Amino acid sequence: MKWLVGLLPLCSYAVAQVHKDPTLDHHWNLWKKTYSKQYKEENEEVARRLIWEKNLKFVMLHNLEHSMGMHSYDLGMNHLGDMTGEEVISLMGSLRVPSQWQRNVTYRSNSNQKLPDSVDWREKGCVTEVKYQGSCGACWAFSAVGALEAQLKLKTGKLVSLSAQNLVDCSTEKYGNKGCNGGFMTTAFQYIIDNNGIDSEASYPYKAMNGKCRYDSKKRAATCSKYTELPFGSEDALKEAVANKGPVSVAIDASHYSFFLYRSGVYYEPSCTQNVNHGVLVVGYGNLNGKDYWLVKNSWGLNFGDQGYIRMARNSGNHCGIASYPSYPEI
């Protein structure tokens, strides 16, 4: 795996310089069992254990502060608890905002429209199950297919998981995408338009690695006629699009420990920037305990966050860049 090379110096340092906390042995073993963690060498396990202990301390202190009303969300030691923030983004982020970005904003707002206070497209059967991208930076592909899956459901009444692997393998150099090394949602939509379709997940399953393009038009599950980009940084436009059109692909800054260890509540990270690095899907919005939020579907499996979802702060100055690059496809 990509992180192993960078981990080698850390392994040597960990064995030579740092000692594990023996009082955490039971909980370490329990956590490994819970998430089926296995390590090839003792040095690797020691290094992972030390990262895990550091993350555990971070989680415990954060949750203590949460109990005192200092945070609007709490954290948990999920399956990513033995990784650093840099590793998580290196493996699972890899968003590639196209260079010389030329925004083609075609969205027309209806500012006089009364929008619902809350929306959740899961309740309308327009959102497929949470996926797990593994150690492949295909977040952009999962965000793109998630948005198109909803449009397919709205048009045909059928909810079908579409193939992220189709995008990883086929939406490549011409579109500026690099498969597991990153891509972008609008260029994925453009590929589907040019290709006259995308296969289903069932016919073209996810492999979490780059492969040869195997698109089969006979197994085409959906098409895309165009896509729409929203105005940069406008949370009002994003809210309107989510309410009226369906789930929207967005890009966010997900590089913080607080993000990948999020468990519940409304995520607000003061150090979050608008330098986006991860593609996700906004499937709704609402208010929880007086905090406005975006309901976001991630692609890090069910063990991430709240069953694979995170509520991110809304109306907080384009927090984490969530309204910087929104787009949605149409069939």
Curated annotation (Swiss-Prot):
Pro-peptide positions on chain: 17-114
Residues bearing carbohydrate: 104
Disulfide bonds: 126-224, 136-180, 170-213, 272-320
Compartments, as annotated in UniProt: Lysosome; Secreted; Cytoplasmic vesicle, Phagosome
Keywords recorded for this protein, A-Z: Cytoplasmic vesicle, Disulfide bond, Glycoprotein, Hydrolase, Lysosome, Protease, Secreted, Signal, Thiol protease, Zymogen
Cited Pfam families: Inhibitor_I29, Peptidase_C1
Catalysed reactions, semicolon-separated: Similar to cathepsin L, but with much less activity on Z-Phe-Arg-|-NHMec, and more activity on the Z-Val-Val-Arg-|-Xaa compound
Annotated protein name in UniProt: Cathepsin S
Species this protein is from: Canis lupus familiaris (Dog)
Gene it is expressed from: CTSS
